[in-house]
């Protein structure tokens, strides 16, 4: 139907402009096909007249000359036809190139319009502004995460209570060792001692025993001298 309406002037002007190169190329190709057929026909005539002239060159010179005349006419017509074919081919190529250029330009314009719609009112300044806001949001998120993970949730620990618990554990250890050696100390007489104080106490007791032995020896010597 669109083709019929086109013959009678129907259809939009834009559609006509779009179809104009195609119609021109179609008409040129039709004419080119006809000229190529004519080229083959003329070439056949030339070959045929050349054969007639060769056949009658010795027996019938008149017929040979007529054949050569027809051959010359066909060659002249063929030369003109070949020129027309070359011209049509050039025109077809020119129109096709122009049409391709137009379609390429139209595609580029459509791409530009699409990019314009995608970007809208977006500008490099707005992009920088949004990126800065995004960085601020990320920094705030990191600060919040740090505050949450570093917060000491619950009651604060009393260091004094920890020291009391440590002394109780040390006293229990001392009591356990005394129980193993058979000794006993009343609960109210127990003294909280440092874990490292036991060795020092034993050293002091040993030194005291040595001093007492020396004193006893000196006392015995004095008694012997008085007895004399």
Swiss-Prot record:
Topology with respect to the bilayer: Peripheral membrane protein
Keyword Transmembrane helix (UniProt): no
Keywords, alphabetical: Coiled coil, Cytoplasm, Endosome, Membrane
Gene Ontology biological process: ATP export; intralumenal vesicle formation; late endosome to vacuole transport via multivesicular body sorting pathway; peroxisome organization; protein transport to vacuole involved in ubiquitin-dependent protein catabolic process via the multivesicular body sorting pathway; reticulophagy; vesicle budding from membrane
Compartment(s) where it occurs, according to its Swiss-Prot or TrEMBL record: Cytoplasm; Endosome membrane
GO cellular component: cytoplasmic side of plasma membrane; cytosol; ESCRT III complex; multivesicular body
Disulfide bonds: none
One MF term in the entry's GO annotations: identical protein binding
Function (record text): Required for the sorting and concentration of proteins resulting in the entry of these proteins into the invaginating vesicles of the multivesicular body (MVB). Also required for the proteolytic cleavage of the transcription factor pacc-1 in response to alkaline ambient pH.
Protein name: Vacuolar-sorting protein snf7
Source organism of this protein record: Neurospora crassa (strain ATCC 24698 / 74-OR23-1A / CBS 708.71 / DSM 1257 / FGSC 987)
């Amino acid at each position: 139907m669109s083709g019929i309406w086109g013959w009678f002037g129907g259809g939009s002007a834009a559609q006509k402009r779009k179809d104009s190169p195609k119609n021109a190329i179609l008409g040129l190709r039709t004419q080119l096909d006809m000229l190529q057929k004519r080229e083959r026909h003329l070439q056949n005539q030339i070959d045929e007249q050349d054969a007639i002239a060769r056949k009658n060159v010795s027996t019938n010179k008149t017929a040979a000359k007529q054949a050569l005349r027809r051959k010359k006419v066909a060659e002249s017509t063929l030369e003109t036809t070949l020129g027309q074919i070359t011209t049509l081919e050039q025109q077809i190529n020119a129109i096709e190139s122009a049409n391709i250029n137009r379609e390429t330009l139209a595609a580029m314009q459509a791409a530009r319009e699409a990019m314009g719609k995608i970007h809208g009112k977006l500008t490099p300044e707005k992009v920088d502004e949004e990126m800065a806001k995004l960085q601020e949001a990320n920094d705030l998120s990191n600060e919040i995460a740090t505050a949450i993970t570093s917060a000491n949730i619950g009651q604060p620990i009393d260091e004094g209570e920890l020291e009391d618990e440590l002394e109780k554990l040390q006293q229990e250890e001392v009591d356990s060792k005394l129980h193993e050696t058979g000794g006993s100390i009343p609960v109210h007489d127990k003294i909280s001692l440092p874990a490292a104080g036991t060795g020092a106490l034993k050293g002091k007791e040993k030194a005291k025993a040595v001093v007492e032995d020396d004193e006893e020896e000196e006392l015995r010597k004095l008694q012997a001298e008085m007895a004399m």
